[in-house]
UniProtKB/Swiss-Prot annotation:
Keyword Metal-binding part of the UniProt annotation: yes
Alphabetically ordered keywords of this record: 4Fe-4S, Iron, Iron-sulfur, Isoprene biosynthesis, Metal-binding, Oxidoreductase
Source organism (scientific name): Haemophilus influenzae (strain 86-028NP)
Protein name as it appears in the record: 4-hydroxy-3-methylbut-2-enyl diphosphate reductase
Lineage: Bacteria, Pseudomonadati, Pseudomonadota, Gammaproteobacteria, Pasteurellales
Catalytic class of the enzyme: oxidoreductase
Amino acid sequence: MKIILANPRGFCAGVDRAISIVELALEIHGAPIYVRHEVVHNRFVVNGLRDRGAIFVEELSEVPDGAIVIFSAHGVSQAVRQEAKDRNLKVFDATCPLVTKVHMQVARASRKGTKAILIGHKGHPEVEGTMGQYSNEDGGIFLIEKVEDIARLPMQDNDDLTFMTQTTLSLDDTAETIAALKEKYPAIQGPHKNDICYATTNRQEAVRELAKLSDLVLVVGSKNSSNSNRLAELASRMGIKSQLLDDPSDIQDDWFNDVKTIGITAGASAPEELVQSIISRLKEFGADTIEELQGLEENMFFEVPKELRIKEVN
């Protein structure tokens, strides 16, 4: 069997930054460091940080007063920020700057009293944080996941409306939903370019090319990773078998029936270390050739907070 590697794949700048913030906080301040929600959606990464002294919690009520807490890459609501301030928690914010950009769009709509529509997945922490940026009682923010949800929106054609999107959605699905929104609300405003992040976009485009050459596409990523799930779905939509896996132990013999070429990619929160361990396991199943596709070079970099950056330089 032949292995073909997608390019780009794996860590994005926002994930790199978020993990660095936890690592540096542990190095400088020592354990324990509390992290609200999984800092990124990858089991391997989270377990590694937990082993070093990070304590992952879902609510700030689980964090002792005055402790250090890190907000995950997915962002938090204004209510969570206020709670941390009220309790004198020392906060390091690992929210991805591209998520923060969407937060600012929502906050702007809230200040103006403009009704906002967010395209995203209900229950995802990024969506909860983004919805929680809207505080103007005279307007409102509404969540839709798909085209069919538009029919239940309560707004009128002449309302002052704007839309934004979760950063890790399917490009195709989101384009379809935006087109349907604009058809129903011709005057609706939105970002000049949709809010789906560069890494999500690049990895989906890379999977399109990978699927054309593969009999099976393996996506390295955790089941709670939105962008990893979208990669597996995209390959399946193209008629190619796909599997989402956390690590080599997930690999099953029957995946390789009639498979000559295996495509491998990784979600934005999956480290290259996992990809290489899966390649090693595939060699035991008979994979003997490895090819890496050419792809876009990513040079995006996001700084860590100043307090940690100074220590990092020293």
